């Protein structure tokens, strides 16, 4: 009764590397995070930091930059990067579009990404596949720049 029992590895106290909260490690779970939300938030912040510095490991053609749309919109002050429109139109929420400034879908560097309103997007050269034979087409189908079709 008064004897100290050794702490099992599964009952080890750990500190969450995201929020700093102390927690008991559960068997089969990571001992770095107290909950799934902390793990996702931490990994999201790490990946966004790679986008900010332009790390090549995150700049792949098959990498999806859309989870960072909210972060990019916050950096822009919550308005369209071109016209400055707020995300509201006639009392309804306006969904902004994540745009690659140079039109290259594989270039996911932070300085090439911006959030724009649908009106500004429709005025760009890349709207609705107008750049159909741009770099994405040649990347996917392996065509030479001189060939079309």
Regions found by a protein language model. Give the residues of each.
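Secondary-structure boundary/linker elements at domain or insertion junctions
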Residues: 1-74, 124-149
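Residue-level preference for short coil/turn positions at secondary-structure junctions
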Residues: 12, 76, 109-111
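Glycine-centered loop/turn positions within well-structured domains
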Residues: 32, 78, 104
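Single, functionally critical "micro-switch" positions that shape active/binding sites
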Residues: 34, 98-99, 120
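Short cysteine-rich loop/turn motifs with clustered Cys
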Residues: 65-96, 117-119
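Histidine-centered nuclease catalytic patch
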Residues: 85-115, 130-136
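Short Fe-S-cluster ligation motifs
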Residues: 111-119, 145-149
